[in-house]
């Protein structure tokens, strides 16, 4: 089974090559890698051309959502995997993902990897804070011994959906450029298309160096929570809590989801969302 791995990148060549090397080293199959290169004047564009890596290119940073949609047109696999350019994939990651995919006789699922980091990961385990001091052996040893269960309601990269779903929902919503709020928006579109399996596969681990690309290039983020709220009438936190039944921390996988439980907590949080919408309408009037 082959995946199409889309990687948007913005002048982050050292981290990108580190990621691609991990994919080549730790994959059991020869997956398709497709880049979208924003700018690329640091040598990224030359690297992609020299190594015959599929890529799209923009002179300026067009944002995560537009980058994903543009690169998607070069993909050929039925399985679309989105990854950050500052990750390191664990050994046999693809076998763990394939094992999960083989459980289903349909494609209504959204599967994610488990982020490991020094901080801000789903699991915090210090294997280094940059590629220069990354302890690969320590990371692989942790992956082999970790007993963390599969996770509920995860909506973090790397994540995989089927091509048919991507086409049905139209990929990423470009009103969320440069990218804040784009992942929960993607999940909401999947939810509205009938997806009820939102699962983090514990064995599929990546080490994440904390979005260095965004910080190093001083990208000004959009207000994704506001855009999501005005689009759907609820904020991403409400969606994560009451629909996905997940959190930014570890919650063991509970299975196929049902519609939200409309209890006191649901209505209390919903009222807060509606008041926030009213506030935005008054302020923007």
Segments predicted by a language model, with ranges:
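Short, acidic, metal-binding catalytic loop of nucleotide-sugar glycosyltransferases
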Residues: 21-30
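A conserved acidic beta->alpha catalytic loop
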Residues: 29, 37-45
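Glycine-rich, basic loop-to-helix element that forms the pyrophosphate-binding segment
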Residues: 58-75
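Short aromatic/hydrophobic "clamp" motif used to bind/position activated sugar donors
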Residues: 80
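Conserved donor NDP-sugar-binding/catalytic core segment of glycosyltransferases
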Residues: 91-130
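Active-site donor/metal-binding and catalytic loop motifs
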Residues: 116, 177, 199-219, 227
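Short, flexible, basic/aromatic active-site loop/helix in glycosyltransferases
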Residues: 129-152, 156
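A short, conserved alpha-helix in the catalytic core of glycosyltransferases
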Residues: 152-170, 176-204
């Amino acid at each position: 089974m082959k995946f199409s791995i889309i990687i948007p990148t913005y002048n982050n060549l050292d981290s990108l090559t580190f990621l691609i090397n991990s994919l080549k080293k730790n994959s059991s199959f020869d997956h398709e890698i497709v880049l979208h290169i924003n700018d690329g004047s640091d040598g990224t564009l030359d690297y992609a051309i020299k190594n015959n890596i599929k890529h799209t290119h923009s002179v300026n940073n067009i944002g995560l959502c537009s980058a994903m949609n543009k690169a998607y047109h070069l993909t050929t696999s039925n399985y679309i995997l989105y990854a950050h350019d500052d990750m390191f994939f664990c050994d046999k990651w693809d076998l763990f993902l394939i094992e999960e995919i083989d459980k289903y006789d349909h494609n209504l699922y959204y599967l994610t990897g488990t982020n490991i980091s020094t901080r801000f990961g789903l699991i915090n385990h210090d294997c280094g804070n940059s590629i220069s001091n990354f302890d690969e052996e320590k990371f692989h040893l942790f992956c082999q011994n970790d007993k963390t269960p599969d996770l509920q309601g995860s909506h973090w990269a790397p994540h995989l959906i089927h091509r048919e779903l991507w086409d049905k929902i139209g990929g990423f919503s470009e009103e969320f450029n440069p990218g804040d709020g784009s992942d929960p928006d993607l999940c909401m579109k999947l939810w509205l298309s009938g997806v009820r399996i939102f699962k983090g596969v514990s064995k599929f681990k990546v080490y994440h160096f904390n979005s260095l690309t965004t910080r190093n290039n001083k990208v000004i983020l959009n207000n994704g929570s506001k855009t999501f709220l005005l689009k759907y009438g609820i904020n991403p936190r409400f969606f994560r809590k009451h629909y996905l039944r997940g959190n930014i921390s570890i919650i063991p996988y509970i299975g196929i989801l049902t519609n939200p439980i409309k209890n006191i907590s649901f209505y209390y949080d919903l009222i807060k969302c509606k008041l926030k919408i009213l506030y935005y309408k008054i302020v923007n009037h």
